Swiss-Prot record:
SMART domains tied to this protein: GATase_5
Main location per the UniProt record: cytoplasm
Species lineage: Bacteria, Bacillati, Bacillota, Bacilli, Bacillales
Recorded catalytic activity of this chain's protein: N(2)-formyl-N(1)-(5-phospho-beta-D-ribosyl)glycinamide + L-glutamine + ATP + H2O = 2-formamido-N(1)-(5-O-phospho-beta-D-ribosyl)acetamidine + L-glutamate + ADP + phosphate + H(+); L-glutamine + H2O = L-glutamate + NH4(+)
Pathway(s) per entry: Purine metabolism; IMP biosynthesis via de novo pathway; 5-amino-1-(5-phospho-D-ribosyl)imidazole from N(2)-formyl-N(1)-(5-phospho-D-ribosyl)glycinamide: step 1/2
Protein name (Swiss-Prot/TrEMBL): Phosphoribosylformylglycinamidine synthase subunit PurQ
GO CC annotation terms, alphabetical: cytoplasm
Originating organism: Exiguobacterium sp. (strain ATCC BAA-1283 / AT1b)
Pfam families according to UniProt: GATase_5
Length: 226
């Protein structure tokens, strides 16, 4: 597969995302800057963490208007994989590609540690390499990761199997311990934890690697190469 790593002003996890898919998995990857207007030739889109546009107004609220985001929306509408991690999740929510909102952490503090996640749905293109209800360890690093949605949206997320990951112990106040969700079609995933920081034993664990291998295995079945 060929991945586009989207780079906004203030992104700081783009190098990690690139390393995960290019160096660890051996897939093709290129940086695509926020000013671009085409994703031609790419099979997957990765929106990394960081502080896009300085997180002014709200996290991700300015990045949603970047020229590349119109193409990301079209890409998602075609059913192709879009992954947003941390600030990338915030951008996807602000852009309307995922429901809900991400607010300040419950304790109003930036949190940086490794947490236990539970795989709630292993039947998505992002989670097929995990076991259902498996516990994995993945780092978090955020100040605004407190996921919230109204009751109707929460009921829909549950009914449609859109809750991909939950926290075993809630670090930030997220409703129902939610750590990551997909869109209804299942091809857009947003999550606050950083799987790209858990792809090598040298970094303390490889539990995040299987998220990327899940995408690649989906690509092997669905992507047609010329």
């Amino acid at each position: 597969m060929k991945f586009a790593v989207i780079v906004f002003p203030g992104s700081n996890c783009d190098l990690d995302m690139y390393h995960a898919v290019k160096d660890v998995l051996g897939e093709e990857a290129e940086y695509v800057f926020h000013t671009e207007t085409s994703l031609e030739g790419f099979d997957g889109v990765l929106l990394p963490g960081g502080f896009s546009y300085g997180d002014y107004l709200r996290c991700g609220s300015i990045a949603q208007f970047s020229p590349i985001m119109a193409e990301v929306k079209r890409f998602a509408e075609e059913g192709r994989p879009v992954l947003g991690v941390c600030n990338g999740f915030q951008v996807l929510v602000e852009a309307g590609l995922l429901p809900g909102v991400l607010m300040r952490n419950r304790d109003l503090k930036f949190m940086c540690k490794t947490v236990d996640l539970v795989v709630e749905n292993n039947e998505t293109m992002f989670t097929s390499e995990y076991a259902a209800q498996e516990t994995i360890r993945v780092p978090i690093a955020h100040g605004e990761g407190n996921y919230y949605c109204d009751d109707a949206t929460l009921a829909a997320l549950k009914a449609n199997g859109q809750i991909a990951f939950t926290y075993k112990e809630n670090p930030n106040g997220s409703v129902e311990n939610i750590a990551g969700i997909t869109n209804e079609a299942g091809n857009v995933l947003g999550m606050m934890p950083h799987p790209e920081r858990a792809v090598e034993a040298l970094l303390g664990g490889e539990d995040g690697k299987r998220l990327f291998t899940s995408i690649v295995k989906w690509g092997a079945r669905h992507v047609t190469y010329n």
